[in-house]
Amino acid sequence: MKRILGLFLVAAMCLSLCACGQSKAAKTVEEAIEAIGEVSIDSNETIANATKLYDILTDSEKSEIPLETRLALLDAQAEFEHLRGEVVYKNAKEAYEKLKEVESLCVTGMDAIYGAWYFGIYEADDGYSFYSMAADVPGISSDELEAAASALGLSYSSVERDWQNALYIVEQVLTTRGDYDTISKNMTEAEKILQSLTEEYDDYTYYPKLKDYFAAVAAYVEFYKAPSGSFQQLKDTINNYENGIRTLSSDVGFLFTK
């Protein structure tokens, strides 16, 4: 009888040891998973640490970790990737919207520059005032032209004498409106966002078109700030820039339709 009781005690002790005999490695992983807590965009290191420790366990050691704890790690990984994706989406969309504003300012501004170029070469001698010039310069009023000319120390007769003065006057209007400042500010901010996306989220490779869009807009901005070539070349150059940008803008905009 004593022998039988002894066997029962040994068996009970073995069962107890099996239940409580979690290895040190498994215990460390369980604690690392519990340390994750509520998942946020700042949980990257704690989740990565717990995942790394879990991955190096043997199958036997992994089985020592409660199922609900293992599932908690999977849930944390999924939640972090979801939050990470939202951050990337938000930042990339912000960059796109800034570039889109730059595109719009360049297109409308270049329309005015083209009109001024045309007027200065072909119509200035037949005009009588800035009212005549405004008819060929879309989006800019005669009052704005007159105020810009005055700021530059020019008059309408200055346009008659030298067609390039028409360009200077329109560029002054755009400067007064703050278009050039907005363009520079937006391009700087968009570039910073793209740099951050590249450095911190380089695995999000589905945004290459956003970078292409940035490059295309940046090239147009350089031309917009200092248009060159003959008047005959001007229209083709504008069309080439704007057609390329329009296509990229459409492709990139599709990414942000949700």
Residue ranges and their predicted role:
Residues 1-11:
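Positively charged n-region of N-terminal signal peptides that target proteins for export
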Residues 3, 21-22:
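Cys/His-rich metal-coordination motifs, chiefly Zn-binding "fingers/knuckles"
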Residues 14, 34, 52, 136, ...:
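Short stretches within intrinsically disordered, low-complexity N-terminal or propeptide regions
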Residues 16-19:
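C-terminal motif of bacterial Sec signal peptides marking the signal peptidase cleavage site
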Residues 22-84:
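Beta-rich interaction/scaffold domains
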Residues 53-60, 193, 248-251:
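Residue position in alpha-helical solenoids
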Residues 70-73, 77, 84-176, 180-190, ...:
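C-terminal amphipathic alpha-helix
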